[in-house]
Amino acid sequence: MQTDEPTGTATSAIRIPPLISLRTTLMVAGLLGNVVAVAAYGLFSRTERYGAVGNPDPGSFIGVAEPVGYFGASLSSALCLGALIYFVMMVWPQADGLIDAQAFRIHLAEERVSIGWLAFALTMVVVQAANDSGVTPAELRTGAALFNAITTSETSRAWIVVTICALLVTLTLRVIIRYSDHFVLLIPAVIGVIATAVTGNAGQGPDHDYATSAVIVFALAIAALSGLKITAALTEVTPSRAVLIVQVVCGVLALAYGAELVYLLSPGAAMIDSDFGRLGLVAGVLVTLVCFSDCWALVMGRPHSDHRTRLTALAMMAVTAATAAMSVQTAPRFLTHRFTAWDVFLGYELPQPPNIVRFFTVWRFDSLIGATAIVLGIGYVAGFVRVRRAGNTWPVGRLVAWLTGCVALVFTSSSGVRTYGSAMFSVHMAEHMTLNMFIPVLLVLGGPVTLALRALSAAGDGQQPGPREWLTWLMHSSVTAFLSHPVTNFILFVGSPYIVYFTPLFDTLVRYHWGHEFMAIHFLLVGYIFYWAIIGIDPGPRRLPYLARIGLLFAVMPFHAFFGIALMTMTSAISAEFYRSVNLPWLASIDADQHIGGAIAWSATELPVIIVIVALMAQWARQDHRVAVREDRHADSTYADDDLNAYNAMLRELSRMRR
């Protein structure tokens, strides 16, 4: 493919097999075998599944359709996500940003898979509503009956989210041919994969905060690994080393977080005595074998043979079937547990009010955000050491800023701040302001992209693009240009709190742990993008003049103050029904607690603004110093040139006079 970037991309070596081939036949046979197995399980376990929890039996059709539909939707979403990841990692755009003919064939395969995902997801909206209501599809023929069944089923509403994501992916793939658009499509693909996972067993009952964070990582790891394996089996492609590393990482994450989920949802003897536990063990064994195979190929530096590629793809297909069968039954832990309001809304108990000591001692580690912060800190240190060993310099102050931000992120997401913030509006607002106003400043001052570009090696001639090339493309892509535009920055940073807290959206988000995770990630990213435009040292598509950056900073601050004042002056509490349901015995008034939250939002902007102004002034002074030094050097060079020209002119004049 002709491009300004490194040549020798994977698309030139990709061979799309004929429609009917040996490997296609084997994959279809494996698919049909898994469908039959899942359908048989749904049929023969129907009485036990519904009887164990006392739910009405919706009939044989729904009893079989639910696990089969879940398997079909899970497999197609995994294949769609895996194909997108493969496309992003193995394909490189041409100079004009378009994809070539070979890559377009992969694009067409993604489009066809997304249509199947959409069909399964749409079907599951009705099937799940009928299953949770205990009625047959015929009883949902009227619009009112179907609407009522969907609104009372949390999982059915999750399938609506999946349907929207699948529709967005399908329609977009239908009209795009640019590489960057495939990168953006990873967002709805990821949301579609985790939407039903967070509303299932992991999102219910005691310790559901632990389980929800774990299932997000687990669902993404299993989907990505399954999709990459099946994509490799169907396209006859030899995965690059980078893809193999991603597969190993996904396998390790799936094993670690899957073990946590089995421990939380099927503890003790239930791990062996229940179908849920046994299916989990089978899936764990298969993932272990696949992960070991990938590790061996990575260490030996040899790609999988065609035979092993097919076997690992079939194994991950069976893992998807096992997890689908687990998802349609109630976890053993909940069958004998008596639920309390704290189990439903928090997942843990808060018998005592918060204080400084409990903020530092009451920990519930967030295995999603907290673990990510630890990985980011370790990765930064590794990059710092590599740059130093190469004989280059990197300011220690940036290292300190980044690590401080990572530590603050772990503390905010996993300490008593998050534990009490899920139940109290005032503490939640302190968490929000820290994630949105303070931590992003520290992370931006660390300059992680610049460090990564110095630490990562560039791909050589004839090699596939690597992480350094992907990062360079991302920082100068149209997506980054749009997000970093001052108008976009202003709207996101100012509008986010008003949209989240002054609309019914907060009523939904505050009830679920996935909602708290969403808010934390959203406010952290919005804050990072905003402060990157003001004090960021990393490369990007545009940079405002320093005076304009100061103007942008002071332009947004009054809106945050107005937001805090609005919270303090409201006559009714936000999400009062939720906070009354939690019913903290030591909280005297939820209205007074919201007033405190508003005061925190009003006053919490001062310290970050001071830090940003100091950093901005320092950057401005250094920039002026560099300009002055450059001008002085140029002036010295100019004077030297003038003297030389005058001397040469004198010599020419003397020569003329002699003649």
Curated annotation (Swiss-Prot):
To M.tuberculosis Rv0102. The chain crosses the membrane at residues 24-44, 71-91, 115-135, 157-177, 183-203, 214-234, 242-262, 279-299, 311-331, 365-385, 393-413, 433-453, 490-510, 517-537, 550-570, 596-616. Keywords: Cell membrane, Membrane, Transmembrane, Transmembrane helix. The lineage of its organism: Bacteria, Bacillati, Actinomycetota, Actinomycetes, Mycobacteriales. It is found in: Cell membrane. The keyword Membrane applies. It is a multi-pass membrane protein. It holds the Pfam family Caa3_CtaG. GO terms for cellular component: plasma membrane. InterPro entries: Caa3_assmbl_CtaG-rel. It comes from the Bacteria. The keyword Transmembrane helix applies. This is Uncharacterized protein ML1998.
